């Protein structure tokens, strides 16, 4: 089973809204919509792991951290993100980090 973190992104929310509309108009079943979301979870996790190669450095003050169920959560204050030509400052950032190598599924494709 893939992590479902990216369902709360702009892309994930748009997909869920579109699927809800299709369900309401009875063009697809709720079971098919669930299958689409599960495939989205697998695809987005795979794409981010394999295709994204950009590097961003950041620095901030650690407010809180937590490790639960193999998931790290960090809350940072006064954070600076640096890319090659850009600097972005934000007051607060929450980072959720999961093991991206294997989420325990034994699927073969």
UniProtKB/Swiss-Prot annotation:
GO terms for cellular component: nucleus; transcription factor TFIIA complex; transcription factor TFIID complex. Gene3D superfamilies: Transcription factor IIA (TFIIA), beta-barrel domain, Transcription factor IIA gamma subunit, alpha-helical domain. The keyword Ribonucleoprotein does not apply. InterPro entries: TFIIA_a-hlx, TFIIA_b-brl, TFIIA_gsu, TFIIA_gsu_C, TFIIA_gsu_N. GO terms for biological process: positive regulation of transcription by RNA polymerase II; positive regulation of transcription initiation by RNA polymerase II; RNA polymerase II preinitiation complex assembly; transcription by RNA polymerase II; transcription initiation at RNA polymerase II promoter. It is found in: Nucleus. SUPFAM superfamilies: Transcription factor IIA (TFIIA), alpha-helical domain (SSF47396), Transcription factor IIA (TFIIA), beta-barrel domain (SSF50784). Keywords: Nucleus, Transcription, Transcription regulation. CDD domains: TFIIA_gamma_C, TFIIA_gamma_N. One of its GO terms (molecular function) is RNA polymerase II-specific DNA-binding transcription factor binding. TFIIA is a heterodimer of the large unprocessed subunit 1 and a small subunit gamma. It was originally believed to be a heterotrimer of an alpha (p35), a beta (p19) and a gamma subunit (p12). Interacts with NCOA6 general coactivator. TFIIA forms a complex with TBP. Interacts with HSF1 (via transactivation domain). Belongs to the TFIIA subunit 2 family. TFIIA is a component of the transcription machinery of RNA polymerase II and plays an important role in transcriptional activation. TFIIA in a complex with TBP mediates transcriptional activity. This is Transcription initiation factor IIA subunit 2. The lineage of its organism: Eukaryota, Metazoa, Chordata, Craniata, Vertebrata.
């Amino acid at each position: 089973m893939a992590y479902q973190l990216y369902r709360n992104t702009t892309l994930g929310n748009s997909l869920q809204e579109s699927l809800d509309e299709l369900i309401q108009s009875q063009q697809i079943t709720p079971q098919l919509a669930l299958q689409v979301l599960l495939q989205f979870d697998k695809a987005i996790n795979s794409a981010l792991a394999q295709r994204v190669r950009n590097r961003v450095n950041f620095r901030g003050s650690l407010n809180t951290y937590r490790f639960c169920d193999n998931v790290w959560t960090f809350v940072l204050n006064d954070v600076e993100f640096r890319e090659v030509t850009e600097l972005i400052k934000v007051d607060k950032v929450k980072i959720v980090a999961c093991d991206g190598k294997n989420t325990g599924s034994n699927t073969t494709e």
